């Protein structure tokens, strides 16, 4: 470890391309310039805060500065200096952005606690809180939310805490146990634990890159926002407010294939299309892979990823790429177990089979179920969903909901174009006739939309 602390600035500089190193040097010259514009060779915390301005919260600026200042320079005469030298600046950025897990872990450790003595889990938790808050802050400040507007002016604290808890849940202690909550906060964290955490939780490194690239306006060309936040395609004249915020979108996107991360197309929303199961079916069928999200009346947010187009039929569909997830009150994903192939189910208008949308489990006992009698559903898991090993996702096993969204992922492939202009009742005459025979009202009649190519 000691060698990592004493690596020379020249060696660290070699990790950057020549044009990148020139940009790093230019930023250092700006930070280290006195009021007269003369470079002093070092810079202070105040100079860094003055440069960053409102782009990052002050707490994160201090953490970045502490991380730089604690890099041991090769010139030992600078070791007790309270300012940051060019060598320290370059070494910190090089190791944080381009270093190995060991080197990144060391820089993170330097940022976590500036005080002497052992680092405890509560220190890591506070660092993670500052990191998550800084990412949400800087993306908002730089206008890089890519269309994801919050229902409030900023990302809700509950969402930040859910993301923090999710990141910490992957931290392993020396006894092999993972972080379990407040009872772990006084446990000591060593360098090896932080290195392993950084390695197993890619979001830590990615979030730090966002803070540097967008907070310091450094090496911006090496960061593509679309790899982190998909573009929100929901052009409704500003009327639409998603259940999701930017942090939950980042979390979900990270579990998708690259081709599904670039843009998300709003297919259905109760806010825009009303409480209608036939409207839901007509908007989500033949649309390719999709993500459905619900918020029950108790505030729990959850849903599932459908790996292929939804089709109305009494058989299960989909494949083992499907998964269930929860967003609030905690973030988690639940992958297939291999126990069965009950990945996706969508049926309507039949008397002998369940009518509704389901994922996982079995008929009448789904891991996630939205009834055709819209606004009702269930999430049954005693002890867990057989298909996805998911717990109960909703607050109550049988739940009510008013908010639901379905997002098409990526571009709509040609094979699906032309299939999505008909009502589900038009394309499924059997469902239509059975609905009429049963005497049930056709709530969607008269509510048909203009075909998409005529908008």
Ranges and model annotations:
Residues 1-5:
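Polybasic, Ser/Thr-rich amphipathic helices
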Residues 6-42, 47-75, 88-96, 110-292, ...:
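Phosphate-recognition beta-domain surfaces
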């Amino acid at each position: 470890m000691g060698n990592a602390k004493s690596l020379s600035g020249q060696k660290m500089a070699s990790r950057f391309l020549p044009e990148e190193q020139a940009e790093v040097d230019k930023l250092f010259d700006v930070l280290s310039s006195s009021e007269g514009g003369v470079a002093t060779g070092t810079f202070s915390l105040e100079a860094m805060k003055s440069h960053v301005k409102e782009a990052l919260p002050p707490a994160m600026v201090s953490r970045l500065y502490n991380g730089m200042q604690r890099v041991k320079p090769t010139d030992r005469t600078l070791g007790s200096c309270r300012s940051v030298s060019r060598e320290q600046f370059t070494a910190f950025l090089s190791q944080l952005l381009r270093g190995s897990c060991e080197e990144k872990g060391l820089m993170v450790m330097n940022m976590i606690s500036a005080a002497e003595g052992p680092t405890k889990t509560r220190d890591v938790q506070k660092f993670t809180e500052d990191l998550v808050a800084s990412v949400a802050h800087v993306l908002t400040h730089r206008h890089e939310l890519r269309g994801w507007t919050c229902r409030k002016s900023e990302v809700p604290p509950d969402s930040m805490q859910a993301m923090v808890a999710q990141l910490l849940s992957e931290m392993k202690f020396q006894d092999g146990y993972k972080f379990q909550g407040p009872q772990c906060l006084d446990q000591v964290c060593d360098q090896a634990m932080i290195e392993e955490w950084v390695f197993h939780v890619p979001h830590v490194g990615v979030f730090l890159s966002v803070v540097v690239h967008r907070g310091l306006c450094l090496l911006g060309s090496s960061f593509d926002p679309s790899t982190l936040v998909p573009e929100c395609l929901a052009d409704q004249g500003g009327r639409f407010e998603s259940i999701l915020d930017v942090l939950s979108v980042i979390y979900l996107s990270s579990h998708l294939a690259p081709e599904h991360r670039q843009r998300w197309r709003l297919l259905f929303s109760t806010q825009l299309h009303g409480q209608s199961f036939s409207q839901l079916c007509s908007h989500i069928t033949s649309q390719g892979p999709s993500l459905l999200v619900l918020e029950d009346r108790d505030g729990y947010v959850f849903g599932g990823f459908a790996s292929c187009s939804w089709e109305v039929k009494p058989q299960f569909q989909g494949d083992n790429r499907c998964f269930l997830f929860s967003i609030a009150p905690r973030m988690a994903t639940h992958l297939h177990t291999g126990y069965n192939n009950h990945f996706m189910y969508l049926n309507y208008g039949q008397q002998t089979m369940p009518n509704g949308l389901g994922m996982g489990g079995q008929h009448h006992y789904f891991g996630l179920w939205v009834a055709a009698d819209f606004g009702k559903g269930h999430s049954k898991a005693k002890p867990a969903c057989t298909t996805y090993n998911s717990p109960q996702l909703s607050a109550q096993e049988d739940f009510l909901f008013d908010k639901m969204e379905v997002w098409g992922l990526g571009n709509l492939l040609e094979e699906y174009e032309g299939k999505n202009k008909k009502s589900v009742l038009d394309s499924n005459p059997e469902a239509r006739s059975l609905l009429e025979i049963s005497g049930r009202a056709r709530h969607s009649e008269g509510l048909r939309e203009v075909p998409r190519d005529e908008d």
